[in-house]
């Protein structure tokens, strides 16, 4: 399953670079490790879209292998548990997806949320949803 990088680059290039302590909820959670060659040289990437309708999708690139998932999420105390078992939580002001520190950006507009929902719909159509 391949999602064109041009659809994901807006998430990566135009997001604020600082993580702010705020309650976790709908928005984009991401981590990117760039290689020495710049923009197209992505070594590791994790992008998770958590939608307000209890749906989520994620795309990861680790060791040049792509993976994706889509499904439902649940709030569990002060964390969010994705249907694939991954937990988003905040510790000492930093947001984590499992053990990986990530940036969290709440949706700034309805247009941004709708764009993320479209990306999730495409990922869901190309992967088996987790339950």
Predicted regions and their residues:
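N-terminal secretory signal peptides that target proteins for export/translocation
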Residues: 1-5
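Sec-dependent N-terminal signal peptides
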Residues: 7-17
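Tryptophan-anchored aromatic micro-motifs
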Residues: 22-44, 71, 75, 118-131
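Short hydrophobic/aromatic-rich beta-strand segments that constitute the beta-sheet cores
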Residues: 31, 55-60, 80-84, 95-99, ...
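N-terminal glycine/threonine-rich, aromatic-flanked beta-hairpin/loop signature
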Residues: 37-79
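Secreted/processed peptides and extracellular or luminal domains of membrane proteins
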Residues: 63, 79, 94, 125-127
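C-terminal partner/receptor-binding element of secreted or periplasmic proteins
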Residues: 97-131
């Amino acid at each position: 399953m391949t999602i064109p990088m041009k659809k994901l680059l807006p998430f990566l290039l135009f997001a604020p670079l600082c993580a702010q302590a705020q309650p976790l909820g709908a928005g984009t959670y991401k981590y990117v490790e760039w290689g020495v060659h710049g923009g197209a040289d992505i070594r590791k990437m994790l992008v998770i879209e958590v939608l307000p309708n209890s749906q989520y999708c994620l795309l990861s690139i680790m060791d040049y292998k792509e993976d994706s998932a889509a499904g439902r999420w649940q709030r569990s105390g002060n964390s969010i548990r994705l249907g694939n078992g991954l937990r988003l939580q905040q510790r000492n002001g930093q947001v984590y997806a499992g053990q990986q520190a990530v940036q969290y950006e709440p949706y700034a507009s309805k247009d941004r949320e709708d764009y993320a929902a479209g990306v999730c719909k495409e990922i869901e159509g190309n992967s088996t949803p987790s339950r």
